[in-house]
Amino acid sequence: MAGVACLGKTADADEWCDSGLGSLGPDAAAPGGPGLGAELGPELSWAPLVFGYVTEDGDTALHLAVIHQHEPFLDFLLGFSAGTEYLDLQNDLGQTALHLAAILGEASTVEKLYAAGAGVLVAERGGHTALHLACRVRAHTCACVLLQPRPSHPRDASDTYLTQSQDCTPDTSHAPAAVDSQPNPENEEEPRDEDWRLQLEAENYDGHTPLHVAVIHKDAEMVRLLRDAGADLNKPEPTCGRTPLHLAVEAQAASVLELLLKAGADPTARMYGGRTPLGSALLRPNPILARLLRAHGAPEPEDEDDKLSPCSSSGSDSDSDNRDEGDEYDDIVVHSGRSQNRQPPSPASKPLPDDPNPA
C-alpha cells in the first residue's frame, strides 16, 4: 500500500487501484459481496488496509476512486460498503464521496453512490449538500439523479437510472423502480422517499436552498428541475427575506423570473423591509423584469418600497449576498475526461460564492 503516497501521479494512481483490485480475485467486486460487517478471513485480510486508508487531507479510498474516476475500483468498494457509514465519511473539507462526484459532474458516479446508500443530506464545511453543489456547478444530470426517490435496494450498473432513460424530469410518483422480480413481502422495506424530498428544503450556512442557489446562478434549466421536483418557490432566504423572485430580479435573470412566475411564484411577496419583486425590478435597468411582473399581477410598489435596503442596491447587475457559504475545495486531480455533464472545474484558489457576479 506504499504506492498510495504517489496518488498525485496518474500512472501510479491507476497502478495502485488496478493492482489492489486485481489481486483480490475475479469475484472480489461482484455485487452482493460479503460487506464490511463480514467476519474477516484470510481472503479479506486486505480490508483493514483499504477501508482504513486515509490521506493527509482526510480522503478515503472511496474519495480517491471518485477523484480519479476509477470506475472498477469504485464498483469494488461499493460492493463491500453499500449501506454502511463508510459511504458518508468526510474529508477535511467535510466532503463525502457524493459531494466530490457532484462537484465533478459525474452523474453515473452520483447514481452509484446514491443507490448504494450515500447520504444526500450530509453537509460539507460550507453547509452544502450534494444537490447544492450540483446547482452551483450546473450539473443538471447529477441533479436529475438526486431528485429521484432512492431505490429500495442497490441496482446493478447496467440497471441504473441513466441507462434506463434520458428524460431528466423527476419522477414524482414516488414509486421506486423494481429491482427484484420476486420480492419477499416479509423483508420488503418502505421506499425511502423522505431524503430526496428533504434535499429541496435543505439550507446551506447562508440559508440558501438549492433553488436559491440555482436562481442566483441564473440557471433556468436547474430551476425547472427543482420546480418539477416540488421545491418551494416562495421560500425566503433568512438574511433579508428575499424569495426566489427577488433573487431572480437582483440577478436580472429574465428567463428564470418568467419561469418562476409561470410556475406560480408569488409576485406580491415582500422582503423583511417591505420591498416587493416589482419594487426591486424598478431599480434595475432591464425593463423586461418589471414588464413580466406586472403581467403576472405584481402590485405597484408603495413609496417606501423605493428606498434602498441593506440587502440590495441599484448599481450592480446582481446584488445578491456575495458572501460565500463554503470554503475552498481541495485541488482535485482528475486524469480522465469521462464526465457525462461537464468538464471538471479547475481548482479554486478562493471560495466559490453563490453570487457569480459579486459586487
Swiss-Prot record:
Annotated segments matching region Disordered: 153-194, 298-359
Tissue expression profile of the protein: Highly expressed in testis followed by spleen.
Transcription regulation found in the keyword field: no
ANK repeats: 57-86, 93-122, 126-155, 206-235, 240-269, 273-302
Biased composition (Polar residues): 160-172
Name of a matching Pfam family: Ank_2
Main location: cytoplasm
Name of the protein: NF-kappa-B inhibitor beta
Organism: Mus musculus
Lineage: Eukaryota, Metazoa, Chordata, Craniata, Vertebrata
